[in-house]
Amino acid sequence: MKNQNNTPIAEEVIHNNPTGYGLFAGIGDNFNSAAQAICELADDAISNLRANSDDPDLSMTVVLSFEDLGDAVEICVVDGGTGIADLGSALTIACRDGAQTPLNEHGFGLKHALASCDSSPDQRWSIRTRTKADAAAEQYREVTAPYTMGTSEEDQPMKVFFYPGAGGLPYQTGTAITVRCPMAKFQTVKPDRKAAQSDFHHLVKYVIEELRYIYAGVLADTNITMKVVEISGGTEKCHVLKPLQPTWEDGTMKRLENVPYDLGGGQLTIHCRYGNILPTKSNAIYYKGNMTSSGVELRINGRAIEHGPVSYTHLTLPTKIV
């Protein structure tokens, strides 16, 4: 039935602006593992370093620290990159102004990671950053929780605070993102096996294996260094990450190198290796020679984006596959 009367007699504004807490609560529980949120934070750091790899003033280092707080874990990701020039854009949902590589091109990763670690009303996170302009002014900038959007009296805009000095940042420029993750959520990094140990040390080991696997190509083929610092009981232990790569059965591995191809999103260079791998018993998750850790492994510029027994019917990628 059509409405024949097209002349309204009145109108009113619909007030449907989201609140920051409502947004975080809505997007905060979509990951199966806290490791996915950790990788979102690492993606931003690596993206910045790769996009500015020709800058001799940068430190090509990403340090991830995990501190045992008992009922929670403090996660901190520090890089020696350029710093974040526009924190407003970085904290705006779907804003792509700061996109530098495919690792941070969608404008959701930082917010999604923070919300996934802690979307509670008393969320705790902070972003400290220092650009070359900040360093010249002998200052750093900081934004702290909660996440707000300035949409109501109860949801006031976030503020950037300027402080003198370097704010504990270990490099001339760079960014430190710190977020509290409840221990129950951090324990999701544990493999889904009854025998898998769940004490803090082993949880950090699972995260290390995840990082070594996800960023194997980055660690093997770029000058970026990644470290994990494990903090528990007042002691610190530093782990320098090495790429986690398969051990091939002799004579089975084949290569297809430097194959140009356009899958519909632009020209790519495809590198492919395939064959039989030997199980690595020391691994908790990857390259164990079982069904779960076998199948297809897909990487973009060295970063794993898919693995396991999957099939692809359509794939559009805008960048180089390594």
Predicted stretch roles:
Residues 100-232:
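GHKL-type ATPase core
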Residues 41, 79, 128-131:
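Glycine-rich, histidine-containing beta strand-loop boundary motifs that form or position
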